[in-house]
Amino acid sequence: MRPLRHPSPDEITLHGILHALADPTRLAIVAALKEQERCVPPDGGDGINCVETMERVKQSLPKSTCSQHFLILREAGLIRSERRGVELFSRLRCRELNERFPGLLQSILSAHAASAPVEAAPVKE
Protein backbone atom coordinates (compact mmCIF):
# COMPACT_ATOMS: atom_id res chain seq x y z
CA MET A 1 0.00 0.00 0.00
CA ARG A 2 1.19 3.48 -0.73
CA PRO A 3 2.24 5.67 2.21
CA LEU A 4 -0.15 8.32 3.49
CA ARG A 5 0.75 11.91 2.73
CA HIS A 6 0.57 14.45 5.54
CA PRO A 7 1.33 18.10 4.81
CA SER A 8 4.24 19.62 6.70
CA PRO A 9 3.29 22.36 9.19
CA ASP A 10 4.45 25.00 6.68
CA GLU A 11 2.08 23.58 4.05
CA ILE A 12 -0.99 23.88 6.30
CA THR A 13 -3.09 26.86 5.26
CA LEU A 14 -5.85 28.76 7.01
CA HIS A 15 -7.99 28.36 3.89
CA GLY A 16 -7.51 24.58 3.95
CA ILE A 17 -8.41 24.31 7.63
CA LEU A 18 -11.51 26.48 7.33
CA HIS A 19 -12.63 24.66 4.19
CA ALA A 20 -12.27 21.27 5.89
CA LEU A 21 -14.12 22.42 9.01
CA ALA A 22 -16.94 24.11 7.06
CA ASP A 23 -18.63 20.72 6.77
CA PRO A 24 -20.64 19.88 9.94
CA THR A 25 -19.70 16.20 9.80
CA ARG A 26 -15.98 16.93 9.58
CA LEU A 27 -16.26 19.48 12.38
CA ALA A 28 -17.97 16.84 14.53
CA ILE A 29 -15.21 14.34 13.66
CA VAL A 30 -12.53 16.81 14.77
CA ALA A 31 -14.46 17.51 18.00
CA ALA A 32 -14.66 13.75 18.66
CA LEU A 33 -10.93 13.36 18.03
CA LYS A 34 -10.22 16.27 20.39
CA GLU A 35 -12.39 14.63 23.06
CA GLN A 36 -10.50 11.34 22.53
CA GLU A 37 -7.24 13.19 23.24
CA ARG A 38 -8.33 13.65 26.82
CA CYS A 39 -8.48 9.87 27.23
CA VAL A 40 -5.06 8.93 25.82
CA PRO A 41 -1.45 9.49 26.94
CA PRO A 42 0.15 12.93 26.31
CA ASP A 43 2.15 11.58 23.34
CA GLY A 44 -1.11 11.52 21.37
CA GLY A 45 -1.79 7.83 21.85
CA ASP A 46 -2.88 5.60 19.05
CA GLY A 47 -5.83 7.60 17.79
CA ILE A 48 -9.14 6.06 16.84
CA ASN A 49 -10.45 4.53 13.65
CA CYS A 50 -13.26 5.72 11.39
CA VAL A 51 -15.92 3.41 12.84
CA GLU A 52 -15.19 4.43 16.45
CA THR A 53 -15.18 8.10 15.48
CA MET A 54 -18.52 7.89 13.70
CA GLU A 55 -20.01 6.11 16.73
CA ARG A 56 -18.87 9.05 18.87
CA VAL A 57 -20.43 11.52 16.42
CA LYS A 58 -23.59 9.42 16.38
CA GLN A 59 -23.74 9.29 12.58
CA SER A 60 -24.11 6.38 10.25
CA LEU A 61 -22.35 7.00 6.95
CA PRO A 62 -21.16 4.69 4.20
CA LYS A 63 -17.52 3.72 4.68
CA SER A 64 -16.54 5.51 1.46
CA THR A 65 -18.09 8.78 2.69
CA CYS A 66 -16.35 8.43 6.05
CA SER A 67 -13.03 7.78 4.30
CA GLN A 68 -13.51 10.86 2.13
CA HIS A 69 -14.10 13.04 5.20
CA PHE A 70 -10.92 11.71 6.83
CA LEU A 71 -8.97 12.28 3.58
CA ILE A 72 -10.05 15.93 3.47
CA LEU A 73 -9.10 16.42 7.13
CA ARG A 74 -5.71 14.78 6.54
CA GLU A 75 -4.98 16.81 3.40
CA ALA A 76 -5.87 20.00 5.29
CA GLY A 77 -3.30 19.04 7.93
CA LEU A 78 -5.80 18.65 10.76
CA ILE A 79 -5.19 14.96 11.45
CA ARG A 80 -2.40 12.45 11.22
CA SER A 81 -3.41 8.94 10.19
CA GLU A 82 -1.51 5.70 10.57
CA ARG A 83 -2.34 2.53 8.69
CA ARG A 84 -2.51 -0.67 10.73
CA GLY A 85 -3.59 -3.60 8.63
CA VAL A 86 -6.69 -2.48 6.75
CA GLU A 87 -7.61 0.20 9.29
CA LEU A 88 -6.54 3.82 9.60
CA PHE A 89 -6.14 5.28 13.07
CA SER A 90 -6.29 9.07 13.25
CA ARG A 91 -5.49 11.73 15.79
CA LEU A 92 -5.42 15.53 15.76
CA ARG A 93 -2.23 17.43 15.06
CA CYS A 94 -2.99 19.88 17.89
CA ARG A 95 0.58 20.88 18.73
CA GLU A 96 1.53 21.52 15.09
CA LEU A 97 -1.70 23.39 14.39
CA ASN A 98 -1.32 25.52 17.50
CA GLU A 99 2.26 26.42 16.54
CA ARG A 100 1.12 27.44 13.05
CA PHE A 101 -2.17 29.14 14.02
CA PRO A 102 -2.15 29.78 17.80
CA GLY A 103 -5.55 29.22 19.40
CA LEU A 104 -7.41 28.68 16.12
CA LEU A 105 -8.48 25.07 16.59
CA GLN A 106 -9.46 25.60 20.23
CA SER A 107 -11.53 28.67 19.28
CA ILE A 108 -13.36 26.79 16.53
CA LEU A 109 -14.04 23.79 18.77
CA SER A 110 -15.21 26.02 21.64
CA ALA A 111 -17.63 27.81 19.31
CA HIS A 112 -18.81 24.44 18.00
CA ALA A 113 -19.42 23.14 21.53
CA ALA A 114 -21.29 26.31 22.50
CA SER A 115 -23.59 26.04 19.48
CA ALA A 116 -24.27 22.31 19.86
CA PRO A 117 -27.86 21.51 20.84
CA VAL A 118 -28.25 20.58 24.47
CA GLU A 119 -29.93 17.23 25.06
CA ALA A 120 -33.06 17.56 27.16
CA ALA A 121 -32.96 16.01 30.60
CA PRO A 122 -35.42 13.18 31.18
CA VAL A 123 -38.67 14.30 32.76
CA LYS A 124 -39.39 12.77 36.16
CA GLU A 125 -43.00 11.89 36.83
Where are the regions that the model predicts?
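N-terminal helix-turn-helix DNA-binding core of bacterial DNA-binding proteins
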Residues: 16-20, 24-62, 84, 88-96
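Short, hydrophobic-biased segments on the C-terminal half of alpha helices
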Residues: 69-71
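N-terminal start-of-chain detector that recognizes signal peptides
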Residues: 1-2, 52-53, 59-63, 79-81, ...
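A short, conserved structural fragment
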Residues: 74-84
